[in-house]
């Protein structure tokens, strides 16, 4: 192999043979290489104290920036905060970003943040936070579901109706943490408690309420709160009371001499057919409460086993079908106060409202007093006077009632809803009643009277109240205020332009009523239709016509021939059923039983989906089947018209 090193002697030239000479001396021995040092063993670990990384808040960063701007040396600032110089210079460079981030969050909440991280949907976040601050400045309490619903509404407004943004509980929690908002339970937001007044005389205990009235508050109501800016248009409500013959048709309202001779010359009219209706709405007409219907029946059969909360109108019982003091108090605390608070909360308004109530018109004793020898009859039919306004308000005084004055013609303040809204409601109700009567044209008016029940009346009352336009309610307030503050008779021409639209709507409804009455009754004059419309405008029936004092009686059925059976399932005619196409024709009793089964099933469905039209038509078919089959109508049956 090749030598490890260069040759010891001179290197011969190429191409020449080396000259002979003495042999070269042997090379000196190379000393052996030192063995490598042994590998060092594991060194003992020495504990080194590492500095913890600290995240500084935006407040600390801005304080360091202000100290540097104030002329302090950066070295001393770094020493105080425990940061290197590069970190401090990075803070100085990011000062505009820090200021902008605080503006986005708002308030002192953002100074505690350590990371500049905004929401994924910045526009929705800013809109919800601005809306939240605006409402809290007015003292409106807000809940989590309400804020989440408003966030989804803002998302649809910003990104369009196809936006899929969902304000979940996680989003709401992050929104709270981002803006430093905490959830608290409010038991009241009243001001400092007023000094307790001196003890007064004992208060007389209120009488027991009927089944339809609500409980009285446990404590005496507090004085009304001081007016902080007054009430807005949506916080001012008005209520009016009116009477209504709920199932009276034009044929039964014929003038004296034109009706049934056996009815005393004033047509068929029953005491149980008249009810009292309470209507309430705010000034703008944007919130209309459910009508309150007061009747003489304590437990109407048609309302049994039904959830009355689903009906568009409420029913209460009164012996004289009038709005008594306990009924008004129960309606105020059970329906008006909860409904108004829900509306104000949904509209993001302050939780306060006022209700203007006109004293119900008392019918004259000559018109409403029954012809009885008993001395307690006039007292029973006379409406009970309403209490003072101080007794009708919530314990905190936020929602209260003011009664309009009722004195001389000059000092009397008319109720706003009495300036055409109540009359429009009655006309719309009677138009829908005539439509139902015309739709049941297959039977006689007697069949319709038996098939139209109080449950259908509640549905028609709610439908008619919904048909009253909000603009009509708002304009009626202008008429009422003009009559209250300018009672001079020579200044009635100022409201003519505002009444043009009302007159057009009024004429259209009257035209519909006349047309429907002509379809239902061929020989009915327009004057008779007008008299039927204004029959229940006064406190009682017209002069010369007394209401029957006994219980509500169904109209007298036409006499049945002696050959017809008087009970269901009896008679020889039912046994002689003929065959038609191999199938026996059902008897009248079987047909009535089948229709009644279908009616019971239909009545247990949602009344908002079924509607009164189909129910009335089915009852009319049952009444017609009874009449054609000669089956007697049982007084205790479910089709007594109530």
From Swiss-Prot:
The keyword Repeat applies. Residues 112-185 form the HTH CENPB-type domain. Residues 47-98 form the HTH psq-type domain. Residues 233-357, 410-477 form the DDE-1 domain. Signal peptide: none annotated. Keywords: DNA-binding, Nucleus, Repeat. Residues 74-94, 145-178 bind DNA. The keyword Repeat applies. One of its GO terms (cellular component) is nucleus. Residues 1-45, 185-233, 535-587 are annotated as: Disordered. It is found in: Nucleus. Residues 1-10, 19-43, 192-202, 218-227, 552-562 have a biased composition (Pro residues). Pfam families: CENP-B_N, DDE_1, HTH_Tnp_Tc5. One of its GO terms (molecular function) is DNA binding. Belongs to the tigger transposable element derived protein family. This is Tigger transposable element-derived protein 5.
